[in-house]
Amino acid sequence: MKILVIGSGGREHALAWKLSASPKVQQVYVAPGNGGTALSPNLKNVPITDLAALRDWALAEKIALTVVGPEQPLAAGVVDDFRAHGLRIFGPTQAAAQLESSKAFSKDFMKRHGIPTAAYETFSDPGAAHAYVDRLGAPIVVKADGLAAGKGVVVAATKEEAHAAIDDMLGGNTLGVAHNDGGARVVIEEFLQGEEASFIVLCDGKNVVAMASSQDHKRLKDGDEGPNTGGMGAYSPAPVVTPDVHARAMRDVILPTIRGMDKDGIPFTGFLYAGLMIDGDGKPKTLEFNTRMGDPETQPIMMRLKSDLVDVLMAATSGKLDEVELQWDRRVALGVVLAAGGYPLSPKKGDLISGLPKPTDEVVVFHAGTVAAGDQIKTSGGRVLCVTALADSVRQAQTKAYDAARTIHFDGMQYRRDIGHRAVKASH
């Protein structure tokens, strides 16, 4: 069978890599893909970004299954369109994707269905937003209501920072985020204390299967300093997600979400990613929902998945996830993102990448912001590569990933040296 993966990041490279390992697959296409997918012998890039043109191509090629990586095509309704033309596609409809594409929809949904989350208010009037911050004080969280590539969130340590973020998002709207009703809007919410975890599940509208737990590193610099990014590294499993926390997350967050969406007439199919904050008592609260796999969490999760992903997604697109039990490698996988100089604000592009190691069973370099120029690979964006390693312990996986990362070079390359530091600490 032929499979299409939509997207161009490290997450899509990892999904395509995993799908291409299935004996049922004749060819995996990635649209538009990147330098890594271009040069992989098992994958083929399709240089189409227009979704209607891609649908026509998929019909002509008789694509048996399409998997959507990023949020933008989901918010644009790619799933609705492919389905309307009889194509099998895994992902949420445009209406269901609002759990991610609209912060206000998401928070109102959680309030309505009793899903634990931070207290919040939504504002489009700067004056009222400033007054709310003055009343609540800091630390406080200010979020642009709409898709902002994971960067539309300011955790303000002081009231001044919060006021500046409001001016930025509502006054200047420098992120250029328009929410679904047009105009700028912010969600301001209480700051939650605890440890974060990425809890990702597969849904078929009614049934849910949990993926392995993982933990992302959002900040640019070591010790969780610097600006927020799309994610600088991740590992799986996350020790903070104990069996007890796992049970609570399913009971208090995931199942009420899937049931609530169904009840609201918007059944959810696809990957659902709950960003959780787990407090000292092991109680999870929902920071945000993403309606797709995380990036870079997908890379270590795919390294650990032993089940045939094609079988799993065919079941998920037939409403048969209740028949699926996922098999996982018991080892730890850890991925380190190598980012371009100037990331996240103004990443450099066009630099030659050298020293890429050949993939092995235990170390794979997934590509994101890369482009193939002949048989050379150049940088083309913010997060360039994700070096992912599998080993018996988090410390060994860390060593293996960093050893591989040190062989790679491109001008201005930057990466964190402490990915997995919480898990290493927890293992002592």
What are these regions (language model features)?
Residues M1-Q94:
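ATP-binding N-terminal substructure of ATP-dependent carboxylate-amine bond-forming enzymes
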Residues K44-D50, E121-D125, A156:
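Short acidic-hydrophobic, aromatic-tinged amphipathic segments that line or gate anion-handling sites
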Residues D50, V371-G374, K378-H428:
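Generic C-terminus detector
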Residues P92-G152:
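A conserved helix-loop-beta module that forms one wall/lid of the active-site cleft
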Residues P116-A118, P139-V142, A156-S198, P256-D264:
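Conserved ATP-binding module of the ATP-grasp superfamily
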Residues M169-N173, L192-V241, M250-E297, P344:
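Phosphate-binding core of ATP-grasp and ATP-grasp-like enzymes
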Residues A249-L272, N290-E362, A373:
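Active-site "cap" helix and flanking loop/linker of ATP-utilizing ligase/carboxylase catalytic domains
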